[in-house]
Amino acid sequence: DWSDPENPSIDHYSKSKTLAEKAAWDFIEAEGKPFEFTVINPALVIGPSLSNDLGESNKAIQMVATGKMPVAVPLQFGYVDVRDVAAAHILAMQKPASDGERFALAEKDMWYEDVAKVLRENGFNKAPKLSVPVWAAKILANFSPELKMALPYIGRVRSVKYTSKAKDLLGWNPRPAEESIVATANQIKDLGLIK
């Protein structure tokens, strides 16, 4: 499915990604398909970074692991490891069947309370133990810039079907999201960003 760029609740990042992809497909069509074209749309990309720059997605894991987010808010995202995104790109280049296809990638959708539980089970004891309902999270968003950005997504159940197409056409086999979450938190800890 495509994001609706005219929807007033869509954030600028998602809108720009949607418009850029549509422009690319329009170009391919207008030019008579001058080359192979495949689109890979990963969900929230987490996992070990090659540098000390965590990136925005890994900062979400940091917020939960450090307790900066003192309660788990009702946010659900698809999670995919950066190493699995790289593998999907390589597979797409190797498999002719990927031409003209769009692949939405995530290993699974998880609520923040589930992410917090995974982190606590792996020694990150500052991860929140309590969850708040949607109405409370929307009130809290007035006091937190990070939550305010996520306001359109609070309480929203994801309905994207991610992996089956990539698994079937590419032979893509992502690692469990839980493994990626822990690897991310461990790297952040090793960088001294989790005490």
Question: Could you tell me what each predicted segment is?
Answer:
Residues 31-35, 47-60, 92-102:
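Glycine/proline-rich active-site loop of Rossmann-fold NAD(P)-dependent oxidoreductases
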Residues 140-171:
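Conserved C-terminal active-site "lid" loop/helix of NAD(P)H-dependent oxidoreductases
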Residues 45-47, 85:
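Conserved sequence/active-site signature of Rossmann-fold short-chain dehydrogenase/reductase
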Residues 2-38:
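Active-site Tyr-X1-5-Lys
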Residues 16, 77-83, 110, 175:
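Residue-level signal for the nucleotide or nucleotide-sugar donor/cofactor binding architecture
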Residues 41-42:
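Conserved SDR Rossmann-fold cofactor-binding beta-strand/turn motif
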Residues 4-9, 51-52, 58-80, 84:
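A conserved pocket-lining segment of Rossmann-fold NAD(P)-dependent short-chain dehydrogenase/reductase
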Residues 88-149, 177-195:
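Mid/C-terminal beta-alpha module of Rossmann-like enzyme folds, strongest
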